[in-house]
């Protein structure tokens, strides 16, 4: 239990809480003998083993860009990822949780340098061997310039990323899809 002396102080674990919970559930299920499953908890996807036919689990990366009518078609994917046993796919983006005021869209991922919604990209997908780490990285990388995020991801072992930019182009880390 954590207590704060200042009653106005709050701790929001939203950027890692779901990923951590998914990882703990997956590990508990594996410890109890589950050998094949794909957990999907609100966009945090975690592979347990392989599919029953021994093939890899495949997860889609949502399309973060609106169509001609301004609608977001998250049923369309811009890429798919083959997840190895124990791998997770976690995506952070500006296209699901937002509101619009005077034609300006405000989403929930805040850039700490501006205290405004981060505007470096539309979405970033992270593949890692820990869903909690993937969740933290997807939020953090979303809130930093692409070049800094690329440098960070390339320094990490067993972590890959796909960036979806506002000009509808994509950048990927050196090991994405391999």
Regions found by a protein language model. Give the residues of each.
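Mature catalytic core of soluble alpha/beta enzymes
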Residues: 1-178
């Amino acid at each position: 239990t954590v207590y704060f002396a200042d009653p106005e102080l709050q701790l929001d674990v939203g950027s890692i809480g779901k990923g951590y919970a998914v990882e703990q559930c997956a590990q508990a299920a594996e410890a109890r003998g589950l050998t094949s499953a794909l957990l999907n908890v609100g966009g945090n996807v975690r592979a347990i083993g392989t599919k029953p036919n021994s093939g890899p689990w495949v997860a889609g990366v949502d399309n973060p860009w609106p169509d001609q009518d301004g609608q977001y078609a998250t049923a369309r994917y811009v890429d798919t990822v083959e997840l190895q046993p124990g791998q997770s796919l976690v995506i952070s983006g500006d296209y699901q949780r937002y509101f619009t005021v005077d034609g300006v869209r405000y989403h929930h991922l805040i850039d700490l340098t501006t205290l405004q919604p981060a505007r470096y990209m539309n979405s970033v997908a992270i593949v890692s061997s820990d869903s909690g780490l993937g969740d933290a990285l997807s939020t953090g990388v979303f809130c930093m310039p692409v070049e800094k995020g690329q440098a960070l991801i390339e320094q990490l072992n067993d972590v890959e990323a796909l960036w979806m930019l506002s000009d509808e182009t994509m950048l990927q880390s050196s090991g994405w899809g391999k």
